[in-house]
């Protein structure tokens, strides 16, 4: 792509440049839409695409039928049933500056005789979907595909809790929106994938797309996908005739909509909305990559119509990527509790998207080799999906002459055992079951706040316990003595007694904390709680088969298979027996208060949002569930109470729009104090 002003080009020069850009864009689009594995950053694709649009606009005679500008999205997977969109699912035109946005506004108002407002909405970074209802019943769901033909993913969409199976009114209607993966779910998924030796997803959008297009619905069910619906194929079944009203009516029907929208009377209002959410984007629980500006009047939308690819009544303002330069000081290899060995770039600290970054995962050896990152390199750094620090590339002009290609280690940096590639894994793995680093990481997890919550038992102390051969597994913690702890660095009588007290107190934890602490693959804190509540004690769970476990609400087949595999291991049986012998509780006790008494929370659906100051989110959740509440992750008309901490965002706005009662943390604390 050249930087020559288009007005200086001849037709021949424009045609030649466009011919160079088209195959590159088509290949990038195939990787993005079909393989869910983008090879370039969105900003790079957007800029090249914008250049091609500008060329073809200035020289219409060079447009070809196979140009990416004449297509919507990508093609569909060959192994999923096809769905024809009677009304095409169009993509949006892009602008990258307020000047371009003003040009769009002037052009649109020049074609409309009467004044009109815009509706501004967040551009969710996910996968476009369409949901078809007949007489209020969900009958089919599909992806956008190429805009004309998508994939039938009905079975997978039925696993997503935010998609209603029955509407509040018996409408026949097609509703469109975005399926996305929340940031927290994305981080947890990538942690599980890396621990399993699988390549991590590049960003939440690709994670959502890969999860939604699975042939196994159990995979989709385990991925914690969510949706925001924002459009309909035909608005006639609705009572509203505005875009803002459409969002409200969809919420009344039972859909999850994004309550952060704002009606804008002019470009000043639009610019203010952009400024607000460009500043807040990193604080949101989901990824956004821009703002969508739509004519608010639905009949006006219909009269303006669309080009072959984009509607004339809407535009997407794309946020510029925040990218900084820093220098790689070292490449460090760490061993996780499952043996996966991960390279991490240690960098000169640099401010990026609201935080100081000094480390960035290089994921696995293949990634490191492909990026060709070397010690001493100056690199471009950004946050993938506004979350994870990620190196885009090295700066070739600044590479030191002495920088050499990095040599991948062949032995474990902890125990010296040979590192291996297991089948179908991109990760290097240490398979020594007695590797000190793996055992230490497992113990750190066991002691963590959401697991056994052993205050004072941090990584440095765990490392010393292993170095001095005081522990071999987590059961040994319960046999430690004061004299043994006094041999550790910086330990006195008081600190030793405090740690022993914390360890002793953890014996009485409810079963779900122990299950989570054991580090069973795919079993997070929520799944552990469901398992413990359903089976009641460890022996019953260990005796259960996959069918019995997967029958539990919120526990899918993948988790069930993982639990059965874990407890089939004789070493696990020995560990559980050791834990039981030292007095660790093996029964579910968290549910006792809720079953024996009632409270103002009994039977209530409660949502937590924002940052709590005195409590942790798990502590608040556990207390609420003990007192009869069901804690959910999204606000709807069925929500009975929202508890809002600091920096509460879209959930608070939606709760207020639905007249859901809102408490602050102090009110929750007061309720907790009353029950003591």
Curated annotation (Swiss-Prot):
Name this polypeptide is given: DNA ligase
Residue ranges of domain BRCT in the record: 596-676
Gene3D superfamilies linked to this entry: 5' to 3' exonuclease, C-terminal subdomain, 6.20.10.30, BRCT domain, DNA ligase/mRNA capping enzyme, Helix hairpin bin, Nucleic acid-binding proteins
Keywords assigned by UniProt, alphabetized: DNA damage, DNA repair, DNA replication, Ligase, Magnesium, Manganese, Metal-binding, NAD, Zinc
Gene Ontology biological process terms, A to Z: DNA repair; DNA replication
Cofactors (names): Mg(2+); Mn(2+)
Sites where the protein binds NAD(+): 42-46, 91-92, 121, 144, 178, 294, 318
Binding site for Zn(2+): 412, 415, 430, 435
Family designation: Belongs to the NAD-dependent DNA ligase family. LigA subfamily.
Cellular-component GO terms for this entry: cytosol
Taxonomic classification: Bacteria, Bacillati, Bacillota, Bacilli, Lactobacillales
Active-site feature positions: 123 (n6-amp-lysine intermediate)
EC nos: 6.5.1.2
Pfam families: BRCT (PF00533), DNA_ligase_aden (PF01653), DNA_ligase_OB (PF03120), DNA_ligase_ZBD (PF03119), HHH_2 (PF12826), HHH_5 (PF14520)
Organism encoding this protein: Levilactobacillus brevis (strain ATCC 367 / BCRC 12310 / CIP 105137 / JCM 1170 / LMG 11437 / NCIMB 947 / NCTC 947)
Tree of life domain: Bacteria
Database matches in HAMAP family: DNA_ligase_A
Enzymatic reactions: NAD(+) + (deoxyribonucleotide)n-3'-hydroxyl + 5'-phospho-(deoxyribonucleotide)m = (deoxyribonucleotide)n+m + AMP + beta-nicotinamide D-nucleotide
